[in-house]
Regions:
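Short, conserved secondary-structure transition motifs
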Residues: 174-181, 261-264
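Metallocofactor- and cofactor-centric catalytic cores in central/energy metabolism, strongly enriched
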Residues: 2-136, 150, 154, 158-163, ...
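Internal helical hairpin/lid segments
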Residues: 233-326
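Active-site-adjacent beta-strand anchor residues
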Residues: 121, 142, 224-225
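A conserved active-site cap/scaffold subdomain adjacent to cofactor or substrate pockets
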Residues: 171, 189-258
Length: 370
């Protein structure tokens, strides 16, 4: 069944141009440049794909945020995934992009080419079946993502416990959006004065998670959908707040997002996970209380604890020429990087921003090469 009739109004050329004209009229009244961070990689791709940046006036600038979980995963965590795959009788599972990002040993795809058992999953629920089919193997799910995907990992874990599947383990890399944005806004060099907040994250956690950012940093935040009309309407809402010297949290994506979020999904996560005290982010460094871990009651499923002796916990240096860290902070654009589209391409990625389909460099490579 086609859903074109549902999507087409949000891609209507007449509506897009009308919103663009209204944005230009209001932007003319701004006293200073409006620097908008679109936190989510999905927004970055929509801006590029539909040429929305070309419809913006010069005094509106977009900077690309850390809303790509694979992009912000440090090499140490990637190395741990490889080390787990290197164990005897192990099967490592993860979702698509995580398989492609190279750590200091290489990527999980390269591990597979060397004969190690590393597998793509289309759904986290597949981990249960693979564990059942391989009772004498150590099956390790590399769980990654923001608040959006965390309930799925929690559901798999709770199902494994209920079904007494004892050979399935979890390497938890679930991270939290508000804390990463807060770390960026705290930087004295930060010029960002408005935010487009991720909507898929908000479906789960609710728009409420951004309220502390509004209160602390006094800037407007709009939870925006991903279609062109969604984004332009959200920009218009940001402009109106800026002109009225307001700093409020508003939801543009009301057809999917509420203030409270999905409380059932939140309960799943709270049943088995808790906040870590520290977590290292690529490009952003250590951010306190910015990620999740398994609760002690689930320690027997925690790959970091069960297989601690196999994990080196080493740190490895990034390529000095790669600007992925600065791009994730919003202080550089992909075109500022000397490696972009030369040494670093989707076929030969140097940095994680090019590897992930949600990465800013991947978006620029696909839609905005010069």
């Amino acid at each position: 069944m086609s859903v074109d009739h549902l999507i087409s109004p949000f891609r209507d050329k007449r509506i897009i141009l009308a919103l663009s004209n209204e944005i230009k009229k209001l932007a003319f009244k701004l006293e200073k440049k409006l620097v908008i961070m679109e936190v989510c990689g999905g927004h970055t791709h929509s801006l590029m794909k539909y040429g929305l940046l070309d419809l913006m006036p010069n005094n509106l600038e977009f900077v690309h945020g850390p809303g790509c979980p694979v992009c912000v995963m440090p090499r140490a965590r990637l190395d741990e995934a490889y080390e787990l795959a290197s164990m005897k009788d192990s099967i490592v599972l993860s979702l698509g992009d995580m398989m492609k990002v190279p750590g200091s040993y290489g990527s999980l795809i390269q591990a597979r080419e060397k004969g190690l058992d590393a597998r793509f999953l289309y759904s986290p629920m597949q981990a249960l079946e693979i564990a059942k089919e391989n009772p004498h193997k150590k099956v390790i799910y590399i769980a990654i993502g923001f608040e959006t995907t965390t309930p799925m990992s929690a559901s798999v874990l709770l199902s494994a416990k209920k079904e007494k599947i004892n050979n399935l383990f979890f390497h938890i890399n679930h991270i939290l959006v508000p804390q990463s944005v807060s770390a960026i806004l705290e930087d004295p060099a930060c010029q960002i004065n408005a935010l487009l907040a991720p909507s898929h994250v908000s479906v789960i956690s609710g728009a409420q998670i951004y309220a502390p950012l509004v209160d602390r940093f006094k800037l407007p935040i709009i939870v925006s959908g991903f279609e062109p009309v969604d984004i332009l309407e959200s920009v218009l809402m940001l402009l109106k707040q800026a002109l009225n010297k307001e700093a409020k949290l508003e939801i543009q994506y009301k057809r999917a997002v509420s203030y409270e979020g999905n409380t059932k999904a939140q309960e799943l996560v709270n049943a088995c996970m808790e906040v870590r005290e520290n977590f290292e982010w690529r490009g952003l460094g250590n951010i306190k209380r910015s990620a999740l871990k398994l609760k002690e009651a689930f320690a027997s499923y925690d790959a970091e604890k069960v297989f601690k002796e196999y994990l080196s916990h080493k740190t490895s240096k990034e390529n000095k020429a790669c600007k992925c860290g600065e791009i994730l902070k919003g202080i550089a654009k992909p075109l500022d990087c000397s490696l972009f589209a030369t040494t670093c391409t989707p076929q030969n990625p140097i940095g994680s921003c090019m590897v992930s389909s949600e990465g800013a460099c991947a978006a620029y490579y696909r839609y905005k090469r010069v």
